[in-house]
């Protein structure tokens, strides 16, 4: 299913409601780096985020090195940022909040 790509103004407005997220230089994704106190906290965040991603059927591009997790969200079918990216970003914010990020 193809989801409508958000207009730049809608992306800026949605980003203003999320702490630490920004628009990638090419405008095709939103990105954030999370820093936790330990690898276990980072991995717990990833596990909780993975469950949210499965529920939304929308999966992140991400990498983990020790206590840091870098995330890139885009909707490949729409070739840009959609509401689904923001739904997953919000879920990730909640997952990080309880982990001292």
UniProtKB/Swiss-Prot annotation:
Its EC number is 4.2.1.96. Keywords: Lyase. GO terms for molecular function: 4-alpha-hydroxytetrahydrobiopterin dehydratase activity. It catalyses: (4aS,6R)-4a-hydroxy-L-erythro-5,6,7,8-tetrahydrobiopterin = (6R)-L-erythro-6,7-dihydrobiopterin + H2O. One of its GO terms (biological process) is tetrahydrobiopterin biosynthetic process. It is an enzyme of class 4 (lyase). Coiled coil: none annotated. Belongs to the pterin-4-alpha-carbinolamine dehydratase family. NCBIfam families: PRK00823.1-2 (NF002017), PRK00823.1-3 (NF002018). This is Putative pterin-4-alpha-carbinolamine dehydratase.
């Amino acid at each position: 299913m193809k989801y409508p790509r958000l207009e730049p103004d809608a992306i800026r407005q949605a980003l203003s409601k999320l702490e630490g997220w920004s628009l990638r230089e090419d405008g095709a994704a939103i990105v954030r780096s999370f820093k936790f106190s330990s690898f276990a906290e980072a991995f717990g965040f990833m596990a909780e985020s993975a469950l949210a991603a499965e529920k939304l059927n929308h999966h992140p591009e991400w990498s983990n090195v020790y206590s840091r997790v870098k995330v890139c969200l885009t909707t490949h079918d729409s070739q840009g940022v959609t509401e689904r990216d923001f739904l997953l970003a919000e879920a990730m914010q909640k997952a990080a909040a309880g982990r001292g990020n």
